[in-house]
């Protein structure tokens, strides 16, 4: 029979979850409509096609 895992205290849960951090997205230098912009790599094609607004 399966045995449930032990309950983890809130302090232990928060300290365990706080070990990872999100990385900053690498920005690409792209010239769009005569303007030099820095955008994430995944948006380069959309920006060149004019599908997204660059303010």
UniProtKB/Swiss-Prot annotation:
It comes from the Bacteria. Disulfide bonds: none annotated. The keyword Transmembrane does not apply. GO terms for biological process: translation. InterPro entries: Ribosomal_bL32, Ribosomal_zn-bd. Keywords: Ribonucleoprotein, Ribosomal protein. GO terms for cellular component: large ribosomal subunit. Belongs to the bacterial ribosomal protein bL32 family. This is Large ribosomal subunit protein bL32. It comes from Corynebacterium jeikeium (strain K411). The lineage of its organism: Bacteria, Bacillati, Actinomycetota, Actinomycetes, Mycobacteriales.
């Amino acid at each position: 029979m399966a045995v449930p895992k032990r309950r983890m205290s809130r302090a232990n849960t928060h300290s365990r979850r706080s070990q990872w951090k999100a990385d900053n997205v690498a920005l690409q230098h792209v010239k769009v409509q005569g303007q030099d912009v820095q955008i994430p790599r995944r948006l380069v094609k959309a920006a060149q096609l004019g599908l997204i607004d660059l303010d």
